[in-house]
Amino acid sequence: MNFGDITVVIVTFKSEHKIYSCIDSIPEESKIIIIENSNDTKFKQKIEAHRSNVECFLTMQNNGYAAGNNFGLKKVKTKFALVLNPDTRLLKNSLKEFYNTAAKNNDFWLIGPNQDFVNNVQNENTLEVDNIKGY
């Protein structure tokens, strides 16, 4: 398994107070692309200095979550991309499980995780669709 095959994309808007625990939960071998939907150059400098595997792009205005992800995903050069929110943290084996699932399944375009909520209750609802039009 090679964490270097994974780029994590995080879209944020002035979330400096939340994002460090997210970044610190990601192995240093993985590249991290942060899309900051503002013109906060101090944030960019601080976040890139925090970890050597972080690259931060400023959009200069809040273009929204979807546009931020589209922008970030275009910057990915690795085999796999993982989209995270700035207020999330990866559990110990999450990235390993993501990599193993992605590496052995060639017929996917999106993989979604189980989510642990308060009191470790998991959301195990699954929806399979042939076409995402209308969702």
Residue ranges and their predicted role:
Residues 85-89:
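The conserved acidic donor/metal-binding loop of glycosyltransferases
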Residues 36-45:
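A conserved acidic beta->alpha catalytic loop
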Residues 81:
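Short aromatic/hydrophobic "clamp" motif used to bind/position activated sugar donors
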Residues 4-10, 26, 30-35:
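Hydrophobic targeting segments
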Residues 93-125:
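Conserved donor NDP-sugar-binding/catalytic core segment of glycosyltransferases
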Residues 12-28:
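Short, well-formed alpha-helical segments that are part of the catalytic scaffolds
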Residues 59-76:
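Glycine-rich, basic loop-to-helix element that forms the pyrophosphate-binding segment
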Residues 43-44, 69, 93-95:
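Acidic donor-diphosphate engagement hotspot in glycosyltransferases and nucleotidyltransferases
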